[in-house]
From Swiss-Prot:
Thiol-specific peroxidase that catalyzes the reduction of hydrogen peroxide and organic hydroperoxides to water and alcohols, respectively. Plays a role in cell protection against oxidative stress by detoxifying peroxides. May be involved in aging-associated changes in the responsiveness to oxidative stress. Involved in the maintenance of global thiol redox homeostasis. Functions in the central nervous system (CNS) and in motor neurons and is essential for normal motor function. Signal peptide: none annotated. It catalyses: a hydroperoxide + [thioredoxin]-dithiol = an alcohol + [thioredoxin]-disulfide + H2O. Keywords: Antioxidant, Disulfide bond, Mitochondrion, Oxidoreductase, Peroxidase, Redox-active center, Transit peptide. This is Thioredoxin-dependent peroxide reductase, mitochondrial. The keyword Zinc does not apply. Its main location: mitochondrion. It comes from Drosophila melanogaster. Its EC number is 1.11.1.24. The lineage of its organism: Eukaryota, Metazoa, Ecdysozoa, Arthropoda, Hexapoda. Residues 1-30 form a transit peptide. PANTHER family: THIOREDOXIN PEROXIDASE, THIOREDOXIN-DEPENDENT PEROXIDE REDUCTASE, MITOCHONDRIAL. The active site is at C85 (cysteine sulfenic acid (-soh) intermediate). The gene is Prx3.
């Protein structure tokens, strides 16, 4: 057997290990490039984001950090110039004062460009546009934000109707995701924020269907104290 042949045989295991190591490195790089930042979980920090948004008919960079100290309703919708989407977007805009009254901002997101958002904001609502909105629309053209919040439909390349309530410390408190054909309830989003704020301020918990106006009874989270609630509502 020649010297070259013997050398090849001796080095086969080393060559195999080198190839395997290279493959692992490539796989790790691909995973890092394509995977979401982290799983979206209630009680954990909301995934960070930043991008260009339409704010008062101009382009501005918007990032999660901008909303520290306030509650944020971050809601995703599929596309501009569609059917259910303008009804939701306008509904949030028409109720914006109610959100501001409880220290809350609203931010809409889709995979459209900021140019598309701007054009849509300049189409009359009677013609399927959204008109001048009282909160920003953020562009997620790269689809990174939608992927990080786990609402992206990979095949269609659009986002589901995800709604995320983020508290003043950047912690995710609640989220829900609707399938494409059904719009969400602004009333329910407001109710949830008020419930979280009530718990923070008073230390009592909010039962099913709690409402600060029509059904304000709460529960003290104590075995004995909770009996006062259940004796009346059980």
């Amino acid at each position: 057997m020649s010297f070259v042949a013997r050398s090849l045989i001796r080095n086969v295991p080393l060559m195999g290990k080198a190839i395997l190591s290279q493959q692992k490195q490539i796989a790790a790089r691909l995973l890092h490039q394509t995977a979401p930042l982290a799983a979206v979980r209630v009680q954990q920090p909301a995934p960070d984001f930043k991008g260009l948004a339409v704010v008062d008919n101009s382009f501005q960079e918007v990032k999660l950090e901008d909303y520290r100290g306030k509650y944020l309703v971050l809601f995703f919708y599929p596309l501009d110039f569609t059917f259910v989407c303008p009804t939701e977007i306008v509904a949030f805009s028409e109720r914006i004062k109610e959100f501001h009254d409880i220290n809350t901002e609203v931010l809409g997101v889709s995979v459209d460009s900021h140019f598309s958002h701007l054009t849509w904001c300049n189409v009359d609502r009677k013609n399927g546009g959204v008109g001048q909105l009282k909160y920003p629309l953020l562009s997620d053209l790269t689809k990174k934000i939608s992927a990080d919040y786990d609402v992206l439909l990979d095949k269609e390349g659009i986002s589901l109707r995800g709604t995320f309530i983020i508290d003043p410390n950047g912690i995710l408190r609640q989220y829900s995701i609707n399938d494409l054909p059904v719009g969400r309830s602004v009333d329910e989003v407001l109710r949830l924020i008020k419930a979280f704020q009530f718990v923070e301020q008073h230390g009592e918990v909010c039962p099913a269907n709690w409402n600060p106006n029509s059904n304000p009874a709460t529960i003290k989270p104590d075995v004995e104290e909770s009996k006062k609630y259940f004796s009346k509502h059980g």
